[in-house]
């Protein structure tokens, strides 16, 4: 049996890199013929992920990393105001270096009869320009979408709409009927780039999806049955492999800026709280609020009477990761810390999200609705209240609340940097609602958590889907049997 190598090209950033590496680990666990090479595109902005990748490389001998050299001509930082366009151009600037690396991998394997052969290129959403490299080298390409099947349905629909009528989306436009999404979708919950006049980058990305040999999606059949069934009946869509939940159960590794003392303080406080009594507030690696909004959150929490754990982070200059608050008294209402901190609540900076969601004291999650966070909350049976920020989070929030009934709706169309301030009374209602002990949402989420765990086990839907993907890459018809 020939050994084979899969080359992954993830976008830089935790939301893309972490699930990519977890999926790579799943593949090598399933088949000892497979090894993985990760082409590591360096982030334009500082990150804390280097220790995470080093730990993976040290613990998994069949996963290796090759750093892609930084290009000399990079898009200016000001373009980050349109993240989709910025990242697309930044990734495109890496194509020559990536082509050189993969060419060397292919030629070295061809010159040795017992070496590992390159069997496929697996690219991220923002890396679809690398499909051209795969075509030039006659290597099959696959898309690994770290988001969900509903988002895939949306992206597949974009080029079709654009061909009929050049897209210029306004939030007040009529709802769209999108194959794969049950309810008509209002433009106010579209990804931000589509409603701020910069949608060309998204359309360009989406137009490449159908050129791949297959699309791997971080979801599972039981969660998104409608969309996945539709994909399987459309011959114009490449085979779709729902392989999720692909989540990192040890998220502390991915964020080395969290020191052990901070983690211990959080977990010790949770250990002292009653079961399912704490609402957790966390808004992702790029989520933050101005001081005016922070005060309203604090007042809403206090009015709710609920115990809370709040990961509070403040805005930083454009394109940089939000920072922990250096002086809580400056941004919180007078006397708030004295009345709540350590008693009814705990405020921290970066937090070990997976460990918190897994804790028996956690009963609800006020979240930005990033897809990784949604999967983690479902896995642990913790219901969400929606407060989306950026990327496709508004669409995620809409579908979780309106289509799937697995989240409580606070806001669906909030956008990071918005001048709109969510008031304390609205936050109070959202917190009280998500903490309701016997709500239908909680029951649905807990049941879906059980289905998620079954899906990834032997005999489960995602386990089978991973097997089909492996068979397509290295099976009878691949030339690598």
UniProtKB/Swiss-Prot annotation:
Optimum temperature is 25 degrees Celsius. UDP-alpha-D-glucose binds at residues 285, 350-351, 368-376, 390-393. It is an enzyme of class 2 (transferase). InterPro entries: UDP-glycosyltransf_plant, UDP_glucos_trans, UDP_glycos_trans_CS. Transmembrane segments: none annotated. Coiled coil: none annotated. Its EC number is 2.4.1.-. Optimum pH is 6.25. The keyword Transferase applies. GO terms for molecular function: UDP-glucosyltransferase activity. Keywords: Glycosyltransferase, Transferase. Glycosyltransferase that possesses chalcone and flavonol 2'-O-glycosyltransferase activity. Converts phloretin to phlorizin (phloretin 2'-O-glucoside), a potent antioxidant. Possesses glycosyltransferase activity toward quercetin, isoliquiritigenin, butein and caffeic acid. Belongs to the UDP-glycosyltransferase family. This is UDP-glycosyltransferase 71K2. It comes from Pyrus communis. The gene is UGT71K2.
């Amino acid at each position: 049996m020939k050994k084979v190598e899969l080359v992954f090209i993830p976008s830089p950033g935790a939301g893309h890199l972490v699930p990519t590496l977890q999926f790579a680990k799943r593949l090598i666990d399933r088949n000892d013929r497979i090894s993985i090479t990760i082409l590591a595109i360096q982030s334009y902005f500082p990150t804390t992920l280097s220790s995470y990748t080093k730990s993976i490389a040290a613990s998994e001998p069949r996963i290796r990393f090759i750093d892609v050299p930084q290009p000399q001509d990079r898009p200016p930082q000001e373009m980050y105001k349109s993240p989709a366009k910025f990242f697309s151009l930044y990734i495109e600037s890496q194509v020559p270096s990536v082509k050189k690396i993969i060419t060397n991998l292919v030629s070295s394997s061809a010159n040795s009869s017992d070496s590992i052969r390159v069997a496929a290129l697996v690219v991220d959403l923002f890396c679809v320009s690398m499909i051209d490299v795969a075509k030039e080298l006659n290597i099959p390409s696959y898309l690994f979408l770290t988001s969900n099947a509903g988002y895939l349905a949306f992206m597949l629909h974009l080029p079709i709409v654009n061909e009929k009528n050049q897209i210029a989306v306004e939030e007040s436009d009529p709802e769209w009927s999108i194959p794969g999404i049950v309810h008509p979708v209002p433009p106010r919950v579209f990804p931000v780039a589509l409603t701020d006049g910069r949608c060309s980058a998204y359309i360009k990305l989406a137009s490449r999806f159908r050129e791949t040999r297959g699309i791997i999606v971080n979801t599972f059949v039981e969660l998104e049955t409608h969309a996945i069934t539709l994909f399987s009946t459309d011959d114009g869509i490449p085979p779709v492999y729902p392989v999720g939940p692909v989540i990192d159960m040890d998220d502390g590794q991915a964020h080395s800026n969290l020191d052990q003392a901070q983690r211990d303080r959080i977990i010790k406080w949770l250990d002292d709280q009653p079961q399912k009594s704490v609402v957790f507030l966390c808004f992702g690696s790029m989520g933050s609020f101005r001081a005016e909004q922070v005060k309203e959150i604090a007042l809403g929490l206090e009015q709710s009477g609920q115990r809370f754990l709040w990961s509070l982070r403040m805005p930083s200059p454009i394109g940089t990761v939000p920072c922990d608050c250096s002086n809580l008294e400056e941004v919180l209402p007078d006397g708030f810390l004295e009345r709540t901190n350590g008693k009814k609540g705990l405020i921290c900076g970066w937090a070990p999200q997976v460990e918190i969601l897994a804790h028996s004291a956690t009963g609800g999650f006020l979240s930005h609705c990033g897809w990784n966070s949604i999967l983690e909350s479902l896995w642990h049976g913790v219901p969400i209240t929606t407060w989306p920020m950026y990327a496709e989070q508004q669409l995620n929030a809409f579908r979780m609340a309106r289509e799937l009934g697995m989240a409580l709706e606070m806001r669906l169309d909030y956008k990071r940097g918005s001048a709109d301030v969510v008031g304390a009374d609205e936050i109070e209602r959202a917190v009280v609602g998500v903490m309701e002990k016997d709500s239908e949402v909680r029951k649905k989420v807990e049941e879906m958590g059980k289905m998620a765990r079954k899906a990834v086990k032997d005999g489960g839907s995602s386990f089978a889907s991973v097997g089909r993907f492996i068979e397509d890459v290295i099976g009878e018809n691949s030339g690598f049997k």
